[in-house]
């Protein structure tokens, strides 16, 4: 899990990063929302500690851009200048927590650990759903799906299993419907989710 810290007050952000690292957590600092939006890999699970008041792009605007991009990890806002409107907007957009600067280290650690626990629980739920869908396939469909995800073409799968290519196509099509995937890339992502 990766904790992203976005704050234009670099000494403050570095101090938070050091605190998190000292607790055995992975953390990275971005000095601006723009740099964060350019550099971050949203596929890496974790959370975001986001300063509200930054030049150019504030925390609420950053959160909105993240939502537009499909961001799904918890956002913990930090601000020295919280007001009711800002807090309401942040929480309506799905903020996990709002902390007032300066924040006590134990309060920050508790908020981060709580947000990471939410991520773990969500990932476990997703994993259970994926495994349940996979278990709903027939044995033959499971064989074909695994071979297809490994990159084998229908004819190669047919040769390996001693069945016709048409039979492979029928089982593969049925499996795609059951797993709610539409293409090989989605199938491979599904299998990765199941194996994680």
Name each model-derived stretch:
Residues 1-12, 16-20, 33, 48, ...:
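Conserved acidic segment of CheY-like receiver
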Residues 29-47:
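Acidic, metal-coordinating helix/loop segments flanking the phosphotransfer/catalytic sites
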Residues 31-32, 57-64:
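Acidic catalytic/metal-coordinating carboxylates
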Residues 51, 79:
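Active-site residues of response regulator receiver
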Residues 54:
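Receiver (REC) domain active-site loop signature in two-component systems and cognate sites
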Residues 83, 102-112, 160:
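C-terminal output helix
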Residues 173-196:
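Basic, Lys/Arg-enriched C-terminal extension of HTH/homeodomain DNA-binding domains
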């Amino acid at each position: 899990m990766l904790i992203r810290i976005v704050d234009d007050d670099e000494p403050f952000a570095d101090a938070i990063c050091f605190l998190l690292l000292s607790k055995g957590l992975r953390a990275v600092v971005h000095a601006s929302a723009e740099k964060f939006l350019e550099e971050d890999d949203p596929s890496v699970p974790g959370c975001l500690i986001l300063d509200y008041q930054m030049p150019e792009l504030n925390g609420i605007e950053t959160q909105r851009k993240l939502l537009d991009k499909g961001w799904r990890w918890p956002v913990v806002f930090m601000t020295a200048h919280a007001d009711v409107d800002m807090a309401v907007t942040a929480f309506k957009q799905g903020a996990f927590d709002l902390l007032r600067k300066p924040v006590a280290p134990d309060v920050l650690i508790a908020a981060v650990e709580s947000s990471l626990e939410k991520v773990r629980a969500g990932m476990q739920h997703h994993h259970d759903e994926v495994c349940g869908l996979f278990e709903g396939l027939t044995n033959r469909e499971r064989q074909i799906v695994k071979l297809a995800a490994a990159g084998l073409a229908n004819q190669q799968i047919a040769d390996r299993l001693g069945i016709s290519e048409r039979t492979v196509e029928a089982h593969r099509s049925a499996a795609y419907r059951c797993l709610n995937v539409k293409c090989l890339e989605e199938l491979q992502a599904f299998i990765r989710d199941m194996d994680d």
